[in-house]
């Protein structure tokens, strides 16, 4: 089965989810001058909507129509639209998971000619690991709105009060022990926040980094499914147990959005998640813990590092007939000038992090980001399979498996993990079913060897 057919089959599996995800998205479409922009409803994207009037003032012949959806719904809807040539979106927010696959399938406009012709855009300024992750055969097919790895944020003030010290490079067992010390639910404080919400980009993102550093893998180099291995089982049980013992109430339904709210409102002592969290955690408008936080590398077990690599990026579907105007918006919202606009208008803690190297050279950003700028860059620089995995694997990706089937496979497995967190099934039962899902996918690749 070639790549396009694999992708089309994967999209078919997502069709029901995508249809359900349309509800609440709002009417799609507009005049001939309207660009329809599909984005994920995360804080940095909401800032872009707030500032988009500036773009429309500079480009009076272009109107912007934003379609925002929660992460899981957004992934399914955008995937179904782009893969089938639906044509309802002119700009889509995707990631380094979709970009190389969709570029290879011919579903995205090659942005390199636009980049090369746009004076002052400076794509060489993008953080190298992010730029490479969004490229196919040397050309960029999406450009980063923000980039991220993962690290641990913790309340320095609570640690000091309890006489605790965060190790320079913590292990997961050390984090569990610290969570146990700080867990005080009777006073509204949980030891740690970890995602439990189903979704291959929700609970599986942090959990897969735990699996990796424990020595687990989804498939070995012969495409044998390995979700029933001792390493995968040990990592999953560790993650589920910690969420159940020291996580937030209702963790099985808590994703990035719930954790960022919980931590920012002073209700969690630690949180392991995306480095992009800093835009909210350190924002005086959104957080009550500004200036009280320390940042540590992603916890490890058997590896030197374990942070993921991810970028929310913007691309133009081949089905759009407004590529030139779409690039005008994309280049505006991912340019150095936009970074400064956010800083000056909304606050420097709100700038999209992890995309451009020059952001970390701005004096205003350096001043407010002293605690987390270097940890962010360090996490991005160590986010590779070589440094975060024990065993070699036949697929790209750290917190995801970079194959078309993973959107469906990951979603199914994530539902099993969430059910285990909720106490509906055991970890063994969850992984027994997950292994069957993975075996079906692995067998299709074995047939091609």
For each of these PLM feature ranges, what is it?
Residues 136-145, 150, 173-225, 232, ...:
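Extracytoplasmic/periplasmic solute-binding protein
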Residues 116, 276-289, 302-411, 447-449:
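C-terminal lobe and pocket-closing loops
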Residues 178-181, 222-253, 294, 298:
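Glycine-centered hinge/linker elements that transmit conformational signals in sensory
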């Amino acid at each position: 089965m070639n790549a396009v057919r694999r992708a089309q089959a994967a999209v078919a599996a997502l069709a029901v989810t995508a249809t359900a995800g349309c509800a609440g998205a709002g009417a799609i479409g507009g005049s001939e001058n309207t660009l329809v922009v599909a984005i994920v409803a995360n804080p940095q994207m909401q800032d872009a909507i707030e500032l988009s009037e500036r773009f429309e003032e500079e480009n009076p012949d272009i109107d912007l129509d934003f379609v925002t959806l929660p992460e899981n719904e957004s992934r399914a809807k955008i995937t179904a639209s782009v893969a089938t040539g639906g044509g309802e979106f002119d700009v889509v927010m995707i990631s380094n998971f979709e970009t190389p696959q969709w570029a290879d399938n011919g579903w995205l406009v090659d942005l390199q000619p636009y980049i090369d012709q746009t004076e002052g855009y400076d794509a060489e300024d993008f953080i190298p690991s992010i730029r490479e992750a969004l490229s196919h055969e040397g050309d960029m097919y999406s450009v980063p709105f923000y980039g991220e790895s993962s690290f641990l944020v913790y309340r320095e003030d609570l640690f000091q009060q309890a006489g605790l010290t965060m190790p320079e490079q913590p292990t997961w067992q050390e984090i569990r022990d610290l969570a146990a010390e700080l867990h005080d639910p009777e006073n509204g404080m949980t030891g740690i926040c970890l995602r439990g919400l189903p979704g291959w980009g929700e609970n599986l993102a942090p959990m897969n980094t735990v699996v990796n550093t424990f020595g687990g893998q989804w498939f070995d180099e012969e495409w044998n499914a390995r979700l029933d291995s001792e390493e995968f089982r040990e990592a999953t049980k560790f993650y589920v147990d910690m969420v159940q013992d020291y996580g937030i109430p209702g963790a099985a339904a808590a994703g990035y959005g719930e954790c960022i709210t919980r931590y920012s409102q002073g209700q969690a002592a630690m949180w392991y998640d995306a480095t992009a969290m800093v835009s909210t955690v350190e924002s005086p408008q959104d957080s009550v813990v500004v200036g009280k936080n320390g940042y540590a590398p992603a916890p490890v077990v058997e590896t030197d590092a374990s942070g993921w690599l991810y970028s929310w990026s913007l691309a133009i579907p081949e089905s759009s007939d407004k590529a030139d105007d779409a690039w005008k918006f994309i280049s505006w919202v991912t340019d150095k000038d936009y970074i400064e606009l956010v800083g000056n208008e909304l606050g420097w803690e709100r700038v999209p992090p992890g995309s451009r190297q020059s952001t970390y050279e701005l004096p205003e950003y350096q001043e407010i980001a002293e605690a987390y700028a270097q940890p962010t860059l360090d996490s991005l620089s160590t986010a590779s399979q070589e440094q975060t995995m024990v065993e070699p694997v036949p697929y790209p990706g750290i917190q995801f498996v970079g194959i078309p089937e993973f959107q469906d496979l990951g979603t199914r497995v994530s539902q099993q993990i969430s059910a285990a967190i909720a106490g509906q099934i055991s970890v063994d039962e969850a992984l027994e079913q997950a292994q069957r899902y993975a075996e079906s996918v692995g067998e299709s690749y074995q047939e091609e060897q």
